[in-house]
Amino acid sequence: MKWIIFVSLFLVSGIVKAQHLPQWLEKAVVYQIYPASFKDSDGDGIGDLKGIESQLDYIKSIGVNTIWISPVFSSEFFDGGYDVTDFYSVDERYGTNSQLVSLVQKVHEKGMKIFMDLVAGHTSDKHPWFLQSKQSDTNLQYSDYFIWTPSKTEKPKQFVS
């Protein structure tokens, strides 16, 4: 039965027309920004959203039409900001949610695109979803968000992603 399903899906996949990249993406010149080390606007030694915004003219002048910003969301920063604790708020070291909205608007006003590095594949162990999932395997809302094993030494054998 598995072979029938596999062969059927394989044959059907050949019928589906391949999607093309958007025209703008085919010719995109992407500039990645790690916010903490890019441009500090307030003198605290950490780059921030206002610092990025202040450099948009320069970024555009070197031929960039797309900016990719590494994670700016609340984090414990054990993993360079990739250990997100809150996907809904900008980490205070970088600024505020309204400053992020302003940055996106300014990027668009200058005719550029912006990619936000959203780290949806993993979170901090301080993230509310992780903490809720950790409480019990019967927590229906969060129990499937993470893979758990009964042992501290045994690692999960089959990762979903």
Where are these regions (language model features)?
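Acidic/aromatic-lined carbohydrate-recognition and catalytic surfaces
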Residues: 20-161
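Positively charged n-region of N-terminal signal peptides that target proteins for export
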Residues: 1-4
